[in-house]
Amino acid sequence: MSQTEKIEEPVPSYLCEEPPEGTVKDHPQQQPGMISRVTGGIFSMTKGAVGATIGGVAWIGGKSFEVTKTAVTSVPSIGVGIVKGSVSAVTGSVAAVGSAVSSKVSGKKKDKSD
């Protein structure tokens, strides 16, 4: 064997750029959307709505269609809400958000002189 001959060894599959055939045949990978990129993968999707929780604050975006009497085509409308400590429910294409709102009401304070 001369020094000019090179022996090529097979490259392991994990060093190749493309995955080996058959590993992703039934489960194609989905590209991350904008919500996934913004929240770092912490998101949940329901029918007709997208929601995310960041630091205890729930972000909910609902998508619905409104049809008016004068328009024949449907006009898409997007609703977005930020709710802290809430319970959200989505049914069909209607996004509903319910929360317990605690308003800060300052009462009349008495002075020490009274």
From Swiss-Prot:
Q: What topology does it adopt in the membrane?
A: Multi-pass membrane protein
Q: Keywords, A to Z?
A: Membrane, Transmembrane, Transmembrane helix
List the transmembrane segments.
40-60, 78-98
Which GO cellular component terms, listed alphabetically, does the Swiss-Prot or TrEMBL entry include? membrane
Q: Which InterPro entries match?
A: UPF0444
The signal peptide stretch is: none
Q: Where, subcellularly, is it found?
A: Membrane
Region (Disordered) location: 1-33
Instruction: Report any Pfam family annotated for this entry.
Output: UPF0444
The principal localisation class reads: membrane
The task this protein performs is described as: May play a role in bone development.
PANTHER family named among the record's database cross-references: PTHR31443
Give the protein family: Belongs to the TMEM263 family.
Recorded protein name is Transmembrane protein 263-A
Native species of this protein? Xenopus laevis
